[in-house]
Swiss-Prot record:
Keywords: GTP-binding, Hydrolase, Nucleotide-binding. The keyword Transmembrane helix does not apply. InterPro entries: Gpn, Gpn3, P-loop_NTPase. GTP binds at residues 13-18, 174-177. CDD domains: GPN3. Small GTPase required for proper localization of RNA polymerase II (RNAPII). May act at an RNAP assembly step prior to nuclear import. This is GPN-loop GTPase 3. Belongs to the GPN-loop GTPase family. The record marks 74 as: Stabilizes the phosphate intermediate. SUPFAM superfamilies: P-loop containing nucleoside triphosphate hydrolases (SSF52540). One of its GO terms (molecular function) is hydrolase activity. A motif (Gly-Pro-Asn (GPN)-loop) lies at residues 72-74. Residues 265-277 have a biased composition (Acidic residues).
Amino acid sequence: MPRYAQLVMGPAGSGKSTYCSTMVQHCGSLNRSVQVVNLDPAAEHFDYPVLADIRELIEVDDVMEDRSLRFGPNGGLVYCMEYFANNFDWLESCLGHTEDDYILFDCPGQIELYTHLPVMKYLVEQLQQWEFRVCGVFLVDSQFMVESFKFLSGVLAALSAMVSLEIPQCNIMTKMDLLGKKAKKEIEKFLDPDMYSMIEDTSNRFKSNKFKKLTEALCGLIDDYSMVRFLPFDRSDEECMNIVLQHIDFAIQYGEDLEFKEPKENEEDKSENFDEFFQDRADEP
């Protein structure tokens, strides 16, 4: 039987560890066994048990303290991940060979690991050799995405990971439970965005015509090919977590030997589900 994996990615502070913790608890309530592997050598703490912890292999602090290497925080993390890529046998021994595994890999947040270095690509290829079906889960903080230019930055980061890793990917806006009513109303348009209208709304903020043309070209590429869409993630809402999990399961065909169901919303009614999600919260006191 195949094994399953989520590669949980996103900028620092986007809620990767919280997502892993919440998803483990949610899957536990569904009688599904899910385990977590920490791949962040700079992680300080997390509130869930881990199947494997890269800090047992190598830590950023140890690398930075090595005077022969003379690395700072970013260089130290890159060194750690390259060292990890040369020691996948350590990960293999930690994972074992149990069939039907479902594992969340909590990854570091430095974007250069996905855009400039092949380390994460090597990891994906190795997991696939071990018969894992891998889905990328790219998280962005919804509190960061309430402005059009910041949203475009988040979209490009998600797109970079998608193009680099060449695996199915679900993009998720986290911390929806922390937004106020006004912010929730603003963020709704970014879940299934019309990139052209977003540019029109901010056209008076461009300081350079070249910058405007570049932004328009990027937005056109994203919009024309429907390359990036986001799902809301509210850890206090079971239905919201179910929708996210169903999309990921569908991407990796989890439980394909059973009668598999499509995600709850089709493209036609996706916006209706988002409307219901925000309407429920608008009615809250």
